[in-house]
């Protein structure tokens, strides 16, 4: 699509790709600090992306040297069967109508599937004026590509930025971009004094220590197992059903994962991606996932049987297990 074209901004140029196979050889070297921009993860998106998503990969060059990489995603909300079924009030119905009819073709500069600043990474310091130019120009070029196909992009979103980055970008071409906050990126810092789960629990107030004990007691009979690739394949249908229940009942959703997403991610990322199954009487009733991102352990998607969740405080126990 863009194989013969490179867009230049002063000394910095960028090139847009629509296939992981086309990416420069040094892509992963540049993206080494963020797994969500590495080819192992991008290949997962390419092989098991949501049915309504198309991905684009942006290489940023200084002369001929690759110094930055970025991700863009196009979503066709017309292909989405539900925006989320938890809230059924009148305002939600109006919101869904507006999205379906006036914002159905949406372009994200960044990763719409996760929270956190995972939209771009550089090997050297680049001023925010240049970053804003690259992101805006990339969005314009991808928008033009779809326009030539007869598809009008209704909404362009740039996500996510830490506050100090947002402040700097607003000084330049982002000055006219509407800024909004949505679901937060929750960060849990581990105290270096904590060497065991007991140390963590001991640091809690009495209220939350009691909650921990109550949740653990409710979890009796649940067996947690780190699933191998073969086991993920074996339980793939159940894993997806558990995920789909949680996703469908979220207050708002713009995509649903493909059924083979978790097995593809396990195959591509190996031990960096962990999927923990929760079994009751040998039946899989829940799962949570973790992905090692440099020195950060990222929580990914999860799923559970709602009846077991209520009775056994499954979700809360998953959160506790993630701290181990």
Region annotations inferred by a language model:
Residues 2, 6-89, 154-310:
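A conserved beta-strand-loop-helix scaffold within acyl/acetyltransferase catalytic domains
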Residues 54-55, 77-176, 296-324:
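Acyl-donor binding region in acyl/amide transferases
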